Every structure is written in C-alpha cells, then in structure tokens.
Amino acid sequence: MARKTAIFVNGGAGRSISSIPAIEKYIEENADLDPIIICEGGTDAYKGHPKLHYRAYDNWHKNLFQDLLKDRDLLSPEPYRVWEYYNQKCSLGQAYDIAINDKGIRDLPRANLKLSKEEILLARKMIAEVKEKTGKDKIVVFQPFGRGAQPEKLDEKQ
C-alpha cells in the first residue's frame, strides 16, 4: 500500500497560486494518498478553496512532523528546475504539474482564489476611488504591500 503524501510549496503568493491547478490534479488522480500541503510561504492562497483549504498547513504548525509528516512521502516541487519551464515550453503552473504529477505538459484549469467578503469590499472601494479620481472606466490595480496592508473599516455600501 502506498504511503500518504505531503506537498511542500515555498515562496510567495505567485508560486502558491501557480501550484493550485497541479495540486488539484494530484488530488483528483491520487485521492487515496490523502495529500496535504505544507505552505512555507503561508496558507492564504488556499484559504476558502473547497478542495485545498482543509489540506493546507503552515510549516510552523504544532507537531507537524510527528502528527502529519513522519509517515508520509514528502514532495518538494521546484518548478524553476523543470526543463520545460526554463526552456520556455510551459508556464509556471504547468511546471508545478510536471514536478508534482510527472505527466508532461498538459492543459490545466485556471487557479481560482476564494476571496473573503472583506477582501471583495476593500477591492470594490479601491476600484471606485481610482475610477473617481482618474475618470477612467477601466483600471488595473496593483497591491504592492503584501500581508502588511491594513484594510480600513468597510461597510456594505462601499
């Protein structure tokens, strides 16, 4: 019988988000291995995800090794070391899929992020403010503050 699996994902939000379709495929194709995700850069990208949320653990989770890892096979995918990626044959998400699932280049669904109500309200407020100030109908918003951003109090109308 095969051992269960733990997949380590390191780096920031971009790497975490890029890993989502490959991990979804792994779960779909290896449900019997009951995979968990060890999120070295935080669990934010997996929060609220119907298949991944309950599988995601911070690397500082109490008793992580003893309770969750010691009886599992450990995968540490490194998409930047995948030949197809560094030869520009595939995307970062596909490189994760190759590193995790070893099925070559294949089409993957888009990564979906589940946003909280607070995040949606904050984004609406930010977009409305920028549209009002610029007079433009279409905008692109970059949020360069990472986890350090402090949202203001919001209400449903904003």
Q: What is each residue range found by the language model?
A:
Residues 1-158:
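Catalytic machinery of carbohydrate-active enzymes
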